């Protein structure tokens, strides 16, 4: 199953590469710089990270690359992450397959390669004001369910993790792993440019860990 998903990801990537330019409806790229990298209630690495991304879209199909790299690469080389993903929007439901990989400081892999990462299949939908996401890692047998909703200008997310094959979200068990409160605003730099900034307070009840993250987008 994992091998099949990897080949499908590679196939979709090749389709995007050889699709005529006029058929690619959208493309975008950018980067975030964050004081630390916290994902689903768990901190990955220490210190600030730069997180570039690129994506292409053709109709309801979208594919992209997302990365996270420690700014101090010599000290935190193991913190690097490079993810490939493809998503199809069916209207009320979007399905996404993501390949998570972890290259070294020089971009190479100690085992396998960029297509030999951990595979997650996820679905997302909206139920009124609530955004619901369910993700499942096929080899790790780890399940994550998150509900996100606004309270005024504040974005709130509540995430539940359940581990199967080993410790991942909740130390080999299951529980509430992510309660976060986020906000964002634009800081005016010039008449024509404002810098988007964001901040999040993240609490992991299962691990009894708390984080405060600040960042900006380019």
Predicted features along the sequence, with ranges:
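Surface-exposed loop and membrane-interface regions of Gram-negative outer-membrane beta-barrel proteins
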Residues: 63-89, 95-113
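Transmembrane beta-strands of outer-membrane beta-barrel proteins
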Residues: 30-34, 55, 64-68, 87, ...
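Outer-membrane beta-barrel "beta-signal"
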Residues: 125, 149, 181-183, 187, ...
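Cleavable N-terminal export/targeting peptides
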Residues: 1-28
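Residues that define the transmembrane beta-barrel architecture of outer-membrane proteins
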Residues: 46-50, 78-82, 115-121, 139-145, ...
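Short loop/turn motifs that connect adjacent beta-strands in outer-membrane beta-barrel proteins
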Residues: 23-26, 60, 92, 126-129, ...
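Detector for outer-membrane/organellar transmembrane beta-barrel domains
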Residues: 109-166, 171-174
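Short glycine/proline- and aromatic-enriched beta-strand/turn motifs that initiate or cap beta-hairpins
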Residues: 24-72, 134
